[in-house]
Amino acid sequence: MAFLVRMLGRADYEPVWRAMQEFTGQRADDTADELWLVEHPPVYTLGMNGDPAHILDAGGVPVVRTDRGGQVTYHGPGQLVLYTLVDLQRRKLGVRRMVSALEQAVIGLLRQYGLEARARGDAPGVYVDGAKIASLGLRVRRGCCYHGVALNVCPELEAFDRIHPCGHAGLAVTRLTDLGVEAQVFEPAAALVRELMVQLGDEEIAA
């Protein structure tokens, strides 16, 4: 099985989210899985069971209650978002395995830059020296998942000061540029997709 990879450029969060819902709701048993790469304008998203109290001060940034798991996170310019529209049932993948594949894909990407990163069992995502560099959340519907992982390449980090990232007060957040990697937002995209392919033993079809 192969993935169809779509580069969406910069796009507002809500239309992309609605498109993921529509894709998942209409897909058939033989619909190809897709990966969407996108950068969003500033937005805070709150998971299904997320506590609004974790948003300290939105500061005029839109807040969207979405249907992924997890608490609150920030998306904005300089952050690379990889959405995974995957038929887990067809691939015989559990949710935990998919989460692990996303985490390990980011860890593998960071290793290419000479950075040692790890996942945490108590707080999904990827961390470098205790600071979070990638957040993730999924929704499963009809045996298929959507949403995905967000990697901080070169975003402004002040927006994270206005929330408890992923529901954890005082959680440190970092980005590639603070770790000595000068990159534009979409530069790591191809390598991140390849790392995910390694984790899932798959092939890529560029769209």
UniProtKB/Swiss-Prot annotation:
Main location: cytoplasm
UniProt keyword Acyltransferase present: yes
Pfam family for this entry, one: LplA-B_cat
Annotated positions for site Lowers pKa of active site Cys: K132
InterPro entries: aa-tRNA-synth_II/BPL/LPL, BPL_LPL_catalytic, Octanoyltransferase, Octanoyltransferase_CS
Active site positions: C166 (acyl-thioester intermediate)
Alphabetic keyword roster: Acyltransferase, Cytoplasm, Transferase
Catalysed reaction equations from the record: octanoyl-[ACP] + L-lysyl-[protein] = N(6)-octanoyl-L-lysyl-[protein] + holo-[ACP] + H(+)
Function, as annotated: Catalyzes the transfer of endogenously produced octanoic acid from octanoyl-acyl-carrier-protein onto the lipoyl domains of lipoate-dependent enzymes. Lipoyl-ACP can also act as a substrate although octanoyl-ACP is likely to be the physiological substrate.
Further remarks about this protein from its record: In the reaction, the free carboxyl group of octanoic acid is attached via an amide linkage to the epsilon-amino group of a specific lysine residue of lipoyl domains of lipoate-dependent enzymes.
Alphabetized PANTHER family for the sequence: LIPOYLTRANSFERASE 2, MITOCHONDRIAL-RELATED, OCTANOYLTRANSFERASE
Protein name: Octanoyltransferase
Annotated organism of origin: Methylococcus capsulatus (strain ATCC 33009 / NCIMB 11132 / Bath)
